[in-house]
UniProtKB/Swiss-Prot annotation:
A GO CC term assigned to this protein in UniProt: endospore-forming forespore
Recorded family membership: Belongs to the SspH family.
Gene (UniProt): sspH2
Residue ranges, annotated region (Disordered): 38-60
NCBIfam families reported for this sequence: PRK03174.1, SASP_H
The keyword ATP-binding is assigned to this record: no
Annotated protein name in UniProt: Small, acid-soluble spore protein H 2
Keywords attached to this entry: Sporulation
Entry annotated with the keyword Ion transport: no
Subcellular location as annotated: Spore core
Upper lineage: Bacteria, Bacillati, Bacillota, Bacilli, Bacillales
Inducers of expression: Expressed only in the forespore compartment of sporulating cells.
Signal peptide from the UniProt entry: none
Amino acid sequence: MDVRRAQEIASSPVMANVTYNGQRIYIEHVDQQKGVATIHPLDNPSQKQSVPVASLEEHS
């Protein structure tokens, strides 16, 4: 995924189907300068982590 699309998803009120390492996640914030996103698994909101945006996959 690219940074622009990750930012669109993070800003959208519509939930997108995005995964990180095969796990469904929620994108909380995107740092466009660093190319990283703050995410958490849908089933564990307290497990926040920063990951490269390129490692995120969007599924339709």
